[in-house]
Amino acid sequence: MSKVGKFLRRTIGLIVAIGIGLLSLPGSARAQGQDCSVPASFYDAEPTLPKTTAAIASRQPVSIVAIGGASTLGRAAGSPDLAWPGRLAAALSSRFTAAPVTVDNRAVARQTAQEMASRLDREVIALKPTLVIWETGTTDAVQGTELDEFRQTIQAGIDRLRASGAEVVLMDMQFSRHTHAVINFDRYGSVLREVTDANEVPLFRRYDIMRHWAENGLFDLTTAGRDKLHLVASRLYDCIGRAVADFITRGALAGTGAPAANSGSHQ
């Protein structure tokens, strides 16, 4: 790889590590009342989460563990409560008031899938979660992890989590035209789709959802100034958190036969 190519890859790696993909909002007025709903067409099928559904229906505690990288850690928002797992907890708690919901954020910035997998036993399975949301693929794409190695790591991780009794949802990468121009995320996204399809594991299509938001003018892919970084990040994470809550809610309601709803705007 040329010196220019190496420089670009390192630069994009730093951008991705920030966890917001150079997203900013086109206008403050629109941002305050943003509608970041997700069309039903983004759900190929209702996620099947029988254990989570049963816990909600019986008003039992629902323990969720989120494991991932910088965009799950949410440091750019300035507070763990503003990261998408924190916003997910708030959204689910407001919807299922009779079933206590907790979301434990076990993210570490810039980790590959293999590095995350090495933490599963002690940091995820040890917590005996009802549901695990595994966000991965970004750092592997940046570092150029071999696809077969990536596939085997994801498969082994799913097997271990399921063997522990936890349900699993995978989350793919973020969308940004800036990073997509240099880093090939498509190959890793394809692997995630293949593995989740083969294992009948729900995949939260964050990449496609964020691209939909960008193409419809909700988010403008321009660089945010340092003074607005926390604000931009917190708004994005709130949208992601509520979209994941919609995803889980669809699975829970599908198990009861009730129609699924979409949160759309702020709760």
Positions of predicted regions on the chain:
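Sec/Tat signal peptide C-region and signal peptidase I cleavage site
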Residues: 27-30
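Internal alpha/beta domain cores that form substrate/cofactor-binding pockets in large enzymes
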Residues: 63-65, 99-127, 139-168
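Active-site segments of SGNH/GDSL-like serine hydrolases
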Residues: 135-139, 157-189
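Catalytic His-Asp segment of secreted/periplasmic serine-dependent ester chemistry enzymes
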Residues: 175-267
